[in-house]
């Protein structure tokens, strides 16, 4: 089964339709339609890679504004990155940026209910920023692969590691069960090989 997976990866770019949870294919295809050459895709690639730079810079600005407790600027930055990510069809990134925009406007994540406490809004923005970065890394890897760049799955940014560590902390009871299952599986092949 593994060799088939390897062949898929080598046969060309990933199928965008397999990643609907993070990328709106029809929106992204509108960007692709602007390419003069479907094989090179230089124009769309420049737009996408420009977004990568823009997102990285905006993440840094958001972190600075969190530290400065500047909700108005955080709302503006969330709005800015929401628009850029929506243009490319980056579903989860857009949704997260909209939440940052709402929290920065002293609202809840939906933007419908007022949230007067600045510290609550700042904490929500920080948590949402961490989530957005994780979703951004997923779609960044997908698009870099789409444009023919080799991307290692092991490459993780610090925020991805933090989210995975938080998930591990939430599920500590499952680990002993897995170990017990692994020990049992290890013993079973020995018994069947006799």
Tell me the role of every PLM-derived stretch.
Residues 1-76, 86-194:
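Two-component system phosphorelay core
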């Amino acid at each position: 089964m593994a060799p088939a997976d390897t062949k898929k990866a080598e046969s060309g770019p990933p199928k965008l339709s397999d990643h609907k949870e993070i990328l709106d294919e029809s929106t992204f295809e509108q960007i692709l339609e602007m390419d003069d050459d479907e094989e090179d895709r230089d124009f769309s690639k420049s737009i996408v890679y420009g977004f990568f730079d823009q997102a990285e810079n905006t993440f840094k600005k958001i972190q600075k504004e969190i530290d400065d407790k500047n909700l108005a600027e955080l709302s503006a930055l969330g709005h800015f990155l929401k628009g850029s990510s929506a243009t490319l069809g980056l579903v989860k990134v857009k949704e997260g940026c909209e939440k940052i925009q709402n929290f920065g406007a002293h609202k809840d994540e939906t933007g419908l209910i007022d949230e007067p406490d600045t510290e609550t809004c700042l904490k929500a923005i920080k948590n949402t920023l961490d989530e957005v970065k994780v979703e951004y890394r997923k779609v960044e890897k997908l698009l870099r692969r789409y444009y023919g760049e080799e991307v290692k799955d092991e490459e993780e940014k610090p925020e991805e590691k933090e989210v995975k560590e938080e998930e591990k902390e939430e599920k500590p009871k499952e680990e002993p069960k897995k170990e017990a299952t692994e020990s049992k599986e290890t013993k079973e092949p020995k018994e069947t090989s006799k």
